[in-house]
C-alpha cells in the first residue's frame, strides 16, 4: 500500500473508501508495506508535514506491530524494476512502491493520481 494509505488506515481511517477499508480488513488479503514507506514517514516527520506521537520512531515501530504486515523487501530486482514502471513523475518513493508491486505481484492501494495513471503494475484506487 502507498505510504499515505498506511498512515490514514491508522490515524484517519475515515479518509479510506469503503472498498479500500474492506480490502484491508479482509483476512483473505495479505497487507504489504515497503521499507520505503517507513523512510517516507520519517522524512515527512523531519519536514514537519506529519506529526506523530510520541515520536516518529516509536510511532513507526508500533504501527509495524499493530496489524499483520508483510514486508516488500527492497532487492536488486525491485531496484531494476523502477526503470520498467511508467510514471508521469520521477518521485523515487513512488517508483520503488510501484516497482515493488510489480515484482511481488501486488496491488498498490493509493489515492495518488500519478500512481493511478501509471503502467506496469496493478493499483486499487482509494475513491
Regions found by a protein language model. Name each.
Residues 1-33, 47-62, 66, 104, ...:
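Short, well-structured N-terminal submotif of metal-dependent ribonuclease cores
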Residues 5-7, 43, 94-98:
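Hydrophobic side chains within alpha-helical segments
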Residues 3-4, 41, 82, 101:
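Generic structural signal for small/hydrophobic residues in well-ordered secondary structure
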Residues 51-58, 65-113:
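Active-site neighborhoods of divalent-metal-dependent phosphate/nucleic-acid chemistry enzymes
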Residues 35-40:
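Short, conserved active-site loops that position catalytic residues or coordinate cofactors/metal ions
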Residues 123-125:
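Basic, glycine-rich
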Residues 33-34, 74:
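Short glycine/serine/threonine-enriched helix-capping/active-site loop
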Amino acid at each position: 500500500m502507498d505510504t499515505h494509505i498506511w498512515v490514514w488506515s491508522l490515524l484517519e481511517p475515515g479518509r479510506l473508501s469503503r472498498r479500500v477499508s474492506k480490502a484491508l480488513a479482509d483476512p483473505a488479503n495479505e497487507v504489504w508495506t515497503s521499507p520505503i514507506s517507513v523512510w517516507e514517514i520519517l522524512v515527512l516527520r523531519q519536514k514537519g508535514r506529519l506529526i506523530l506521537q510520541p515520536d516518529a520512531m516509536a510511532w513507526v515501530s508500533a504501527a509495524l506491530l499493530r496489524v499483520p504486515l508483510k514486508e516488500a523487501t527492497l532487492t536488486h530486482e525491485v531496484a531494476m524494476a523502477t526503470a520498467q514502471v511508467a510514471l508521469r513523475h520521477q518521485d523515487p518513493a513512488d517508483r520503488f512502491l510501484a516497482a515493488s508491486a510489480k515484482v511481488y505481484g501486488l496491488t498498490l492501494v493509493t489515492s495518488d493520481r500519478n500512481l493511478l495513471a501509471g503502467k506496469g503494475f496493478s493499483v486499487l484506487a482509494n475513491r
